[in-house]
Swiss-Prot record:
A biological process term (GO) from this entry: glycogen biosynthetic process
Organism: Nitratidesulfovibrio vulgaris (strain DP4) (Desulfovibrio vulgaris)
InterPro entries: A-amylase/branching_C, Branching_enzy, GlgB, GlgB_N_E_set_prok, Glyco_hydro_13_cat_dom, Glyco_hydro_13_N, Glyco_hydro_b, Glycoside_hydrolase_SF
Positions annotated as active site in the UniProt record: 317 (nucleophile), 370 (proton donor)
Quaternary structure and partners: Monomer.
Keywords: Carbohydrate metabolism, Glycogen biosynthesis, Glycogen metabolism, Glycosyltransferase, Transferase
Catalytic activities: Transfers a segment of a (1->4)-alpha-D-glucan chain to a primary hydroxy group in a similar glucan chain
The keyword RNA-binding belongs to this UniProt entry's keyword annotation: no
Pathway: Glycan biosynthesis; glycogen biosynthesis
Protein family: Belongs to the glycosyl hydrolase 13 family. GlgB subfamily.
Protein name: 1,4-alpha-glucan branching enzyme GlgB
EC number, UniProt record: 2.4.1.18
Cellular component GO terms, alphabetical: cytosol
Biological role stated in the UniProt entry: Catalyzes the formation of the alpha-1,6-glucosidic linkages in glycogen by scission of a 1,4-alpha-linked oligosaccharide from growing alpha-1,4-glucan chains and the subsequent attachment of the oligosaccharide to the alpha-1,6 position.
Length: 640
């Protein structure tokens, strides 16, 4: 084997200056491995940031995995080591051999690798960026023109690509990106969802982490194919009218010796003090957000997914753990900030910066925060003191609603406040209502199995939950399997229980979710004013004795929608509900319809509003089905 001779590599001083300032928005094109030609020879240029290393060498296919003989050279005092290596080909495996400041030699993956080998291997793969001809120009232009979808329907189907469907019998369990495109895209669009949210696709060594312990931040996982395969998948989603959101993990990273931790023999990407640099729950390192180069690594990574893969949004995981220095720590296990407080000021600055940059460079791209505390202004603009996210997950709504529905209906009257409390803060943020993967793992059971009663009541409760979620102000998110009433808790090692579609009750649940999505899209009152009081009005929230609530969804210049919910298995006849106008009100949705697997109690498709001669206004008198929700709209041209 001919061992290539590495050569010094010139990097523009301005690129290094921007990196040192934490401001290089295309940093992934400077660091990492990229095809190049030098003196007529084709190869790859390599660059890595390791300011405290004693030496850095390239080891890989190109030199028989020798640890010496192919050195990288320091680029001034920037802390960057770089070299051009002739003869390296696309697809070659490589690692950096870093002799750290502590004298120890470690084989490290490239932090900016564009692809990585399939687990259990952790080597980086020499690849390129510009490898796909995009066909989604119309989608991208329209996204930029319309801006954030605050007043448009958003219904997100959360998916773990490795367990949505699986292959059987050929030894490789995962579908490819192209196979996922063939199956997942038509399924999601057929169900009426507007977006997919993918659990992290950045390469990760452990399946059981679901991608939340990221090993290669710039490399789409090889489980499903190549980086251009993932680009084809996103392209096909856009051409089918489906947005793509990625889960992104800037909160922490794994401690594996080959990864970012102690990269040059020092705490480079993390804090040295474990009270700042180690997460006690997950056994991971926490990024040092106060270091310019680390902030740049993360900010450029966010821009990389948006720019190079045309991603429509990033959902940032575990934001609460970033915001608080004492998160999950006892007294004496954390260090206060410079003002003596518990807020992680560096993390706050980072979140504001990354949100500002994303919204400036990619109008219409969303950022979503999984944030479970009462931190104010998470989804408010940075210039008003907020963190700058587009949306925040409403964890309080999720917790209270699931807790309420887990109660036996006979006890729900005593927990009525759990159902109505969310409206006290529903417009304090731009909320997404999440029924996510976190609610169907670790012994929590599937959504269907959380519901009380016999099988029929469980299914009716689930249909009622979905109608309440879709009717409630806020954007919608549902984890895969929930749409057809998966019985079993989610297991990342096996596919969903698709066999349940053979049962009419489960098919009925899926029909309901599809119809709720179509109602969300077609009725402006269901989505246009999701984030302020003008889109919602209580009709009756106080009938706790019957466990019945009713409210209006509103949009200026559009017909109102009247939603009524009966959270008991009791059929309530001659039930009066006030309404804002007279005439005929047509039924748009009844979750007790036999079409959805219900008992088919209803009102023959419409009710007539009558004048209330005593209290003024109008009312309808109707039959409320058991454990069901109903939606009515006035027939246009009638009433006053």
């Amino acid at each position: 084997m001919t061992i290539p001779c590495s050569r010094p590599l010139f990097i523009e001083p301005f690129d290094l200056y921007l990196f040192g300032m934490g401001r290089h928005r295309h940093l992934y094109r400077i660091l990492g491995a990229h095809p190049a030609v030098q003196d007529g020879e084709a190869g790859y240029r390599f660059a890595v940031w390791a300011p405290n290393a004693r030496s850095v060498h390239l080891s890989g296919d190109c030199n028989g995995w020798r640890h010496e003989g192919c050195p990288l050279f320091p680029v001034g005092v920037s802390g960057v080591w770089a070299a051009f290596v002739p003869g390296v080909r696309r697809g070659s495996l490589y690692k950096f051999v870093v002799r750290g400041a502590d004298g120890r030699q470690e084989q490290k993956a490239d932090p900016f690798a564009l692809w990585a080998e399939m687990r259990p291997g952790v080597a980086s793969v020499a690849w390129d960026i510009d490898n796909h001809a995009w066909g989604d120009g119309a989608w991208m232009a329209e996204r930029a023109r319309q801006g954030l979808p605050l007043e448009r329907p958003v219904s997100i189907y959360e998916v773990h690509l490795g367990s949505w469907r699986r292959r059987h019998g050929d030894g490789h369990p995962f579908l490819t990106y192209d196979e996922l495109g063939d199956q997942l895209i038509p399924y999601a669009t057929g169900m009426g969802f507007t977006h997919l949210e993918l659990l992290p696709v950045a390469e990760h060594p452990l399946d059981q982490s679901w991608g939340y312990q990221t090993g290669h931040y710039y490399a789409p996982t090889s489980r499903f194919g190549s980086p251009e395969g993932f680009k084809r998948f996103v392209d096909r989603c856009h051409q089918a009218g489906l947005g793509v959101i990625l889960d992104w993990v800037p909160a922490h990273f794994p401690r594996d010796a080959w990864s970012l931790g102690r990269f040059d023999g020092t705490a480079l990407y993390e804090h040295l003090d474990p009270r700042l640099g180690e997460h006690p729950d997950w056994g991971t390192y926490i990024f040092n957000y106060g270091r310019n180069e680390v902030r740049n690594f993360l900010t450029a990574n966010a821009l990389y997914w948006l720019r190079e893969f045309h991603i429509d949004g990033l959902r940032m995981d575990a934001v609460a753990s970033m915001l608080y220095l004492d998160y999950s720590r006892e007294a004496g296990q954390w260090l206060p900030n410079r003002h003596g407080g518990r807020e992680n000021l560096d993390a706050v600055d980072f979140l504001r910066e990354v949100n500002t940059v994303i919204h400036a460079e990619f109008p219409g791209a969303m950022t979503l925060a999984e944030e479970s505390t009462a931190w104010p202004g998470v989804s408010r603009p940075v210039y008003t003191g907020g963190l700058g996210f587009s949306f925040k997950w409403n964890m309080g709504w999720m917790h209270d609603t699931l807790g309420y529905l887990a109660e036996d209906p006979i006890h729900r009257a005593y927990h009525h406040g759990s159902l109505t409390f969310s409206m006290l803060y529903a417009f304090s943020e731009n909320f997404v209502l999440p029924l996510s993967h976190d609610e169907v793992v670790h012994g929590k059971g599937a959504l269907l199995s959380k519901m009380p009663g016999d099988m029929w009541q469980q299914q009716a409760n689930l249909r009622l939950l979905y109608a309440y979620q879709w009717a409630h102000p806020g954007k919608k998110l549902l984890f895969m399997g929930g749409e057809f009433g998966q019985w079993n808790e989610w297991d990342e090692s096996r596919e969903l229980d698709w066999c349940l579609y053979r049962f009419p009750a489960h098919e009925g649940i899926a029909r309901l979710v599809g119809d709720l999505n179509r109602l969300l899209r077609s009725e402006p009152a269901m989505h246009r004013r999701d984030h302020d009081w003008s889109g919602f009005r209580w009709v009756d929230f106080a009938d706790y004795g019957s466990s019945v609530i009713s409210f209006l969804r509103l949009a200026e210049g559009e017909r109102p929608l009247l939603w009524i919910f009966n959270f008991t298995p009791v059929v309530r006849r001659f039930y009066r509900v006030p309404c804002p106008r007279g005439g005929t009100w047509r039924e748009l949705c009844n979750t007790d319809s036999a079409y959805y697997g219900g008992s088919d109690v209803g009102n023959a498709g419409a009710v007539m509003a009558r004048e209330d001669h005593w209290g003024g206004g109008h009312f309808i008198e109707l039959t409320l089905p058991p454990l069901a929700a109903m939606c009515f709209a006035p027939v246009t041209g009638q009433g006053t």
